Every structure is written in structure tokens, then in C-alpha cells.
Amino acid sequence: MSDNWVVQNLENALETWNEKLAEIWQLITTTPQDFKGGGIWGVIVNINGAVQSIGLALLVLFFVAGMVKTCGSFTEVKKPEHALKLFVRFAIAKGAITYGMELMLALFNIVQGTISTIMGSAGFSTPQQTVLPPELITSVEECGFFESIPLWAVTLIGGLFITVMSFILIMTVYGRFFKLYMYTALAPIPLSTFAGEPSQNVGKSFIKSYCAVCLEGAVIVLSCIIFSLFASSPPVVNPDAVAVTQVWSYIGELLFNMLVLVGSVKMSDRIIREMMGL
């Protein structure tokens, strides 16, 4: 690392960015069972088991409400075709509550397979590192004390923006994990709505929303891949310009690329919901 304070500040900011980007890459390929050693998942499984009793109680409620609304009289219920339809609906809803976690993990694993395919097709095992161009470092190191004063201001602003965006990026990915846990913990309640025909749309919306949360990972990976391709060809620095102009030009273009990535990751849920018509 250079001894120059301006260069050190920029390199530290970029190091934070690269660390968060690598952490995102690791988080996206991690399963909820393995996240943070699996301790959180153990608690979520216990909560899901406890909520299942509430889901089963609601199952009966939605089933009776649906039966009353769809059947005009008790005579219709006694018809074989109606009785069979009601029995199948009840059995499916009961199975969805009992084996809901297995269903959700199966959907998650399908999406994880898609994410792995995207990574393999793009040829990326880790995101591209963002580094300062050597010519920019040389120009900054050759500056005198008074020439370095405006560079300090530019560097402080640029380094602050890069650090803030790094944390916004990682918070979004952590937020996706929290949503996965919340969906899993409370799954029996919305899944119980499959017991009644009038209420089944709630269960369908829940499954669609859960799939959307899982697919957010694919959008995040695609965003990181596109940014890595941008980072592989860093902003062009004019060696004939003064150092402060070079640094300002480099930071400006770099921040723009980072803002595009942060915006894409932040809007990953919106992009998926638009794709799925939610």
C-alpha cells in the first residue's frame, strides 16, 4: 500500500467495497440452514412448528367457511363429487401446512440451482476486485503539499460515498435473508387458506411472494456480474490532466457504476415482482 494519505484513503474505501461485494457473493450461495452457523434456522424451525398448530386451527375455519360459501345447502355436500372435491382440498391444505417447510426449501433449492447456473455460465467464481489505476497513484504521489489539499476534500467525499454504498449493498442482501426467515416461520398461517376456495388466493399470493424473494438472489448475482465486467475495465484516466482532475474524474465514473449496482440490488424485489406480475 502507498504511503500517501490520499491514496491510502481511496484504497481503504475500495477495500471495504471489495470485502462487502465478496461477502454478498458468499451470502447469495449460502442456504438458510447454514447462515451464521445454523443457529437462526434452528429457532425458525421451532417457531414454524409452534405456528403449525395455529395453522391447523385456521385450516378448519377456512374449510368450513369455504364449504358454506361454495355449497348452497347440506344436500350438495352429500353429493359424491362435492364431497370428493372438499376432501381433496382439505387434504392438500393439510399437507401444505405439515410439509410447508419442505416445499419452501425445495423452491429455494431450485432458485439456488438457477443462481449456480448463472454463475457458471458467466464464468465467475468471485466478483472482480476494484483497484486504483497505477497511473492515478503515480500522479497523486507526485503532488506537493498545497496541490494535495483539494485532493483531500475530493478523496474524503469519494471515500465516504463508497463506504456508505458498501453498507447499503450488504444490508439489502441481509434483508433478503431476514425475509426468507420470516416467510418460513409464518408459513403455516397463509398456507392454511388453501382449505377454502374463497380464501385460496391468499395462499397463492404467499407462494408467489416467497418465490419472488428467492429469485431476488438471481437479480443480485446478475447485477454483481454486470458490475464486475464494468470493474474489469476501470475508468480511463487522462495522465496529462492535473491530479485533482484525474481523481475527480475517476471517482465520479466509479461512483456512477457503483450507484447503478446499488440501485439494481435495491430494486431486485421490484424487478422480480414486475416479472411475475405481483
Q: Where do the language-model regions lie?
A:
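Binding/recognition "hotspot" determinant
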Residues: 1-58
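Alpha-helical transmembrane segments and their helix-start/interface "positive-inside/aromatic belt" motifs
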Residues: 2-10, 80-100, 203-213
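Short amphipathic alpha-helical coupling elements at transmembrane boundaries
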Residues: 23-26, 82-89, 109, 116, ...
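Alpha-helical membrane-interface segments at transmembrane helix boundaries
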Residues: 44-52, 84-88, 92, 175, ...
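Hydrophobic alpha-helical transmembrane segments
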Residues: 53-65, 157, 161-163, 180
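Hydrophobic transmembrane alpha-helix segments characteristic of membrane transport
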Residues: 58-94, 186-200
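Non-cytosolic segments of integral membrane proteins
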Residues: 94-186, 224-277
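Alpha-helical transmembrane segments
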Residues: 191-208, 240, 271-275
